[in-house]
Amino acid sequence: MGITLPSHDRLPRAPCTPTSSARTMPETPHPRTILRGHKAQVHALAFVGNNDRLASGDAEGYVALWDLTIMRPTAVWQPHDNAILGIQGWGADRIITHGRDHKLAVWKLATSDEANLSKKLPLDDTSEPRPQPWLLHLIDVNTMNFCAFAACVPTDPPPAGDDPELLLAVPNTLASESIDIYHLPTQTRRHTVKSPGQNGMVMALALVPQGDSLTLLAGYENGVTTAMHLSAASGTWNTTYRTQPHSQPVLSLDVSPDGLSFVTSSADAVVARHPVPPPAGMEVLEQPLKVVNTKHSGQQSLRFRDDGRVFATGGWDAMVRVYSGKTMKEVAVLKWHEVGCYAVAFASALKAPQAAGGVEERDGTVVRRAGEVSVRERRIAHAEAAHWLAAGSKDGKISLWDIF
C-alpha cells in the first residue's frame, strides 16, 4: 500500500552543552526530525537557499527538495535514471545533480518555481507525473568511479550582468584515473589532468581557487591523495603534494573553509589532514599535517561546516561522527540509524538569517512591531538560524540534527 502523506517524526530536542575543551553534544543526543520519503538509499545531501531547503538524492535517481520550515517536500523529480552521486546548490536558484547515468545536470529552481512541481515523494505509490524543473545545462560525464563532481567559481568572474560561471571537475570520460575540468555556461572541457602515477580510479575531488590560478585535489583507489596546481603562466598542471596515508580507497575529502588544508576519509579507519600547498611551491610535499586512526573504518561523505569549527562523516556502522576542525578530536557521535550512513551535509553557520516580518526601521534602528510576527515567519527564522546537520542512510531516511 502506498504512502499518501509524507511523514516526519518530531523528536525532543537535545540541547548542546559546553565542555572544557569544546562545546559538544550531550551523552544521548536525539535528531530534531526524521524525514521519510525515499525508498532507496540516500546517497547525496545539500542545503540550498538560505538554510531553509535541503536537497536529497537517492539510489534510484530521485531528488527531493525539503522545506525545513514545515519539514515537508516542496519539489520532487527524477533527474537521473540511476543513483545520484552528488548534489550542490549554485547561486540562489540553481541546483546541480550528478547521476550514475553518465549525466551532470544544472536545474533552475527558484522558490517561485516550486508550486509547479510535484510533492509526491518516491515512497508514494502514484501514477502522477513528476515534472522536472527547467534544465539549463546537461553534460555527458564518466560515472563508473562512484566519484561525485567538484565545483568552484573561477577566480576571474564575468562582468556584472553576464551569465554566472562555474568550473566542474569529474573523472575523465575514457580514463578513470584522469580528471576532466568543464566550464559553465559554455559546457566546454577546459582541462584534462592525468594522475601522477598508477593510483587506480579517482574516488574523490575538490577544486580550490588560489590567486589567479587553481589547485585540484584528488583521492584515489589505492589510498593516495594529491594536489595538482595549474600554472597561470604555462597552462600546465604540476603536482605539488602527494602522500598515501590510507591503506584502502579514499572515500571522501573536503577543504577547510580557510582553503589552507583538506581532510580525507577512507575505507580504512584513518582520517588525515593535508596541506593545500601555495602556488609558488617549488618542491612536492609528501607529509600530511596530521593522521588520526579513529578505530572506525568506512567513514565517508566528510564535510566541513563553513565556520571551520567542526567536520562530520557518515559511517558504514550507521554512526555520524563529528570532529573538531582544529584538533580533529571526536566531539560527538550521533546514533539513530540502524544501517550505514552514506551522506552528510551541514547548513551554513555563517549566513545571517533574513529579517522576519513585523519589523520596521526607526532612525536606523530595526524595531519589532509587537504581535505582528506570524507562525510561518517564526518557522522561517528558526530554519535559517539552526545549525543543521543532515545525515542520509541506506534505510532511505534522513535524520536532521541541530548541533552546536
Curated annotation (Swiss-Prot):
GO terms for biological process: chromatin organization. GO terms for cellular component: nucleus. Its main location: nucleus. It is found in: Nucleus. WD repeats lie at residues 37-76, 79-117, 197-238, 245-286, 294-333, 370-404. Residues 1-31 are annotated as: Disordered. Keywords: Chromatin regulator, Nucleus, Repeat, WD repeat. Transmembrane segments: none annotated. SUPFAM superfamilies: WD40 repeat-like. Component of the ASTRA complex involved in chromatin remodeling. Component of the ASTRA chromatin remodeling machinery complex. Belongs to the WD repeat ASA1 family. This is ASTRA-associated protein 1. The gene is asa1.
